Amino acid sequence: MVELYNDYKLMDEIKDNQGNAGALWKDLAECIKWQQEQADVLPDAHWVGGNPWDGKKANVDGWAAWNGKKSVLTLRNPSASAQTFTTTLREALDIPAYVRGKITLTHAFNQAELDGMPINKAIDIDTPLVLNLPGSSVFIYNGR
């Protein structure tokens, strides 16, 4: 069972880029559709990156999942300042050492480009990725 609590007034008030109220309802529907499309990979979800707050600093964190056929990767910079995060897809997706290959990432949602993240290009899972996340940002990717 899943429960979802909404602030109806807030959901109704927020406007989209054209000034139409109720934009958050569309966003919620888009997220639910994405979740349904990723239902086969999401059970593998695990944490990625650092501790969101280690007592001194807000660190880049997120979650990822991989099932051998597809993957999802979410990265978040909770800090107001830009931060650099270095990883490989093997490390982020927790891919076993015996697996070799490449993954092509695409944007899961309409989002800005992330400096250092190749999109729509096959990435060897052991290639280091040096990612520059702007402050207060979230990036979500689908992978195949």
Give residue ranges: language-model regions.
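Active-site-proximal substrate-binding groove within the catalytic cores of carbohydrate-active enzymes
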Residues: 1-112, 128-135, 143
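Short beta-strand and strand-turn-strand segments in soluble, beta-rich domains
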Residues: 113-125
